[in-house]
Amino acid sequence: MADSSLVVLVDMDGVLADFDRAVIEALKPTCPDIRVSAHSHRLHRAFPAYAEQIKTVTSARGFFSGLKPVQHAVAGWRLLAELGYQPRICSSPLAAHPDCEAEKRGWLADLLGEQAAFEAYIVRDKCSCPGIALIDDIPSVECEPSDWEHIVFDMPYNQQSPSARRLRGWLDPKLPDLLLGARRRYRQRAGQ
């Protein structure tokens, strides 16, 4: 069992895997104005006229298997381990995709190894996962109480995030300090 004071939860879609780019590339021929939105982290909300096409693309077999990694994602994952943390994927499944969990685990195994795939949390409720921090592109996470702190993975659509902690890509030099602070506060809350 992992020591929760060393676990860093990492979202998959938008943080490790370039979900939006895959959707945009698939839809560009028929939806030329679709792009990463500055207003919503959900493409189907930012472009409601394309909601059905987006659902068709993201629920297709092979969608998750074919995702490309976010720039420097593998280096960032390795850095977490080099810093002494235990990175764990914490990702939500898409209900409309019948093979979502299996494809996500396959993608993780190919990119990060079998252990990362095996240890991944593919759950609807990220709040229940133990750790000191959750690195996620979602602008805000409603979890009370939660053991972990939300670190926003910088994207155009989360600039208005209320989170005081922000990671500007995997090579952001603030990463070690963000995690050190999260671990210190986690241990204080736990009385360690």
Predicted feature locations:
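Conserved Lys-Pro-Asp/Glu-containing loop-to-beta segment of HAD-superfamily phosphomonoesterases
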Residues: 117-146
